[in-house]
Swiss-Prot record:
It is found in: Secreted. One of its GO terms (cellular component) is extracellular region. This is Bacteriocin thailandicin. GO terms for biological process: defense response to bacterium; killing of cells of another organism. Cyclopeptide antibiotic with bacteriolytic activity against the Gram-positive bacteria S.aureus and S.thermophilus, and lower activity against the Gram-negative bacteria E.coli and P.aeruginosa. Keywords: Antibiotic, Antimicrobial, Bacteriocin, Secreted. The keyword Secreted applies. The keyword Cell wall biogenesis/degradation does not apply. It comes from the Bacteria. There is a cross-link at L23-W86 (Cyclopeptide (Leu-Trp)).
Amino acid sequence: KKNMLLVNPIVGIGGLFVGAPMLTANLGISSYAAKKVIDDINTGSAVATIIALVTAVVGGGLITAGIVATTKSLIKKYGAKYSAAW
């Protein structure tokens, strides 16, 4: 849970969302924390999309918007477990 306090603001506000394996490798968080990030996107997908788009407009977050959209489509198509593994 301690890792999630650091990851959620970075992912949500900073627009640095990447796939779960990249989260674990780049940010040094557990697989559990990465799965929680995927769950947060799945639960609040509209909010995540809005944040990603605003970040894209503000500067440089276009990749983030694409990754969030990809994650959302993977969740719909294959489920949250596959998306977390991606």
